[in-house]
Amino acid sequence: MANNFLEVNNVDFKAGGKTKVKNVSFSVQNEGDIICLLGPSGIGKTTILRTIAGLEKINNGSIIINNKTISSKKIHIEPEDRNISLAFQDNSLFPHYNVEKNILIGTEKKNKKKIKINAKEIVEFLNLKKILNKYPHEISAGEAQRSSLARALVSNPDLLLLDEPLSNVDQSFKEEIQVELKQLLSKSKITTIIVTHDSYEAFYLGSKCGII
């Protein structure tokens, strides 16, 4: 266990007096692995991602990355200090910013030269160049999903968390984006955890899958 890239150990999380996650444990063995967590809606998959990202403080257990505890009952490293990116299910693009500014949000304190290089490569790979000056209401659901992925990847995080990344994409675009996403994750070699209720998606995208 000590050599695992990520360890989630017996994690409990409560909110509003209710238990949202209880005694959850899993691990990611190697950097670059793509892990899919498969389970029905409402079971706590998103909450697990939020605890890993540091958006929620756990009540019991621990979360460890590269042998460093980032969450426990007594320890809570803030989200901005974790180098973890979380792409939400609803894209969460800011409506008053264009696509380019949405992609670069949160990179202000990063190395500008590296961010510029990363952004250029990701934008080209995801075919976003033509919509950089457009606003979220002017683009398709598929383009919005690609923009959200670009934002999550541009800072080159240690860990990428994807919450139902294709759930809001029209079925006619879904297969195309699945292929693009798999290629992008393989190319980036960023350790990734994807939560989904779609078994085909889980086994297509993931190098390993777990059922919650």
Regions inferred by a protein language model and the residue ranges of each:
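Conserved ABC ATPase signature
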Residues: 135-139, 143-145
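ABC ATPase NBD coupling module
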Residues: 70-86, 109
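A short, proline-enriched helix->beta-strand linker immediately N-terminal to the Walker B motif
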Residues: 154-158
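Short coil-to-helix segment of the ABC ATPase nucleotide-binding domain corresponding to the Q-loop/switch region
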Residues: 97-106
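Catalytic Walker B motif of ABC-type/P-loop ATPase nucleotide-binding domains
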Residues: 160-164
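The feature captures the beta-strand-to-loop junction immediately N-terminal to the Walker
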Residues: 38-40
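Conserved ABC ATPase "signature" region
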Residues: 114-131, 183
